[in-house]
């Protein structure tokens, strides 16, 4: 009788323990599948052009007259046009071509650094992109997705103050574009770059947060159809 009681207790304990354990729920995200990532990124691959809208203010809230400084292609009303390239699956980055980062000098407080930055040529800025579900709370393979643009850092070497310095322009890219994978072709959406900080020789010398007056935004409007594939 004692042995039977011990067996019953043991079985009860096992049932109790198994009841406390739940199998993890696997969320099948459509946008985690390699075949989907490859298909979407290769669909975006190509050269594009779009209206380019800079919003640049210094600490005195003076706005940069970018239209008079822009040397590239423009629309009929003088709005700058920027060219950019989407890499495909093997290179999931979008590259903004010939960005006038010399305009950053307008918001820099250090006059010597500002003068050096003003002399910089145009640079290409590369921004990594990825795909994710826009409906991650559900356990369904939703085809509503979003393009996520990552941050980008632009390093330059400058000589000023009698020394050579490594300067890093730290851009945030908060853009996320929601799309339906069943509706093709997908669009890249608006891409926005925000200059958040300037780093010289691994030291942050200026943060651009809007509270002190300086603002540096570059907005590239959405363009659906590529110039070339």
What kind of feature is each model-predicted range?
Residues 48-50, 65-69, 99-101, 108, ...:
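Extended beta-sheet lipid-handling architectures
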Residues 1-4:
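Positively charged n-region of N-terminal signal peptides that target proteins for export
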Residues 149-229:
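Glycine-rich, aromatic-bearing surface loops/beta-hairpins
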Residues 26-39, 47-99, 206-216:
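Short, solvent-exposed loop/hinge segments that bridge or flank secondary-structure elements
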Residues 79-174:
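Predominantly extracellular/secreted and cell-surface proteins with exposed
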Residues 13-42, 219-229:
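Bacterial Sec-dependent N-terminal signal peptides
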